[in-house]
Amino acid sequence: VIVGVPTLGLPLGEGVARRLGHERMVALGTSRKFWYDEALSRPLVSITSPGQGKRLYLDPRMLPLLAGRRVAVVDDVISTGTSIDAVLGLLALGGVTPVVVLAGMLQGERWRTTLSFAGHLDRVAGALATPRFTRRGDGGWEPEA
């Protein structure tokens, strides 16, 4: 079963699921529906939306689709690892341990520390790896040290 991570991991996950011949995927969400259980949510911090206080939700109706299945999590980018760590923690609340975390891009190396502490480092794979960039004083960019 493919689990897609909002926001851009959802279309990527849908494409992976379709390519694998799956008829559906499980989409995590950031907007709470009235039937969601707050116990199946986690705080979400992202470098693309800092300080916004989002939550990540797992629809309780999707738990039977995940129970006892091989699960792959799909996200667009893993950079600091905090978002994907929240995803893995959320799935653990539902009794789900993914066999792999797939990312379109692994950005920099900071994610390794976060996921290493959580014990998830060995499950991560990416299509490509790039450095993280920081802005120089002259307005240009350089790879983060």
Model feature map: region roles:
Residues 1-6:
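Short glycine-rich phosphate-binding loop at a beta-alpha junction
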Residues 7, 30-32, 107, 129:
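Short, ordered loop/turn segments at secondary-structure junctions
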Residues 9-13, 109-112:
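Short, well-ordered alpha-helical microsegments
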Residues 10, 81, 85:
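Glycine-rich SAM-binding Motif I of class I
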Residues 11-20, 88:
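Short Gly/Thr/Asp-enriched flexible loops that form oxyanion-binding sites at enzyme active sites
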Residues 21-71, 141-144:
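Short, glycine/charge-rich flexible loops or terminal/linker lids adjacent to PRPP-binding catalytic cores
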Residues 75-77, 81:
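DG-centered beta-turn motif at the end of beta-strands
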Residues 85-145:
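PRPP-dependent phosphoribosyltransferase catalytic core
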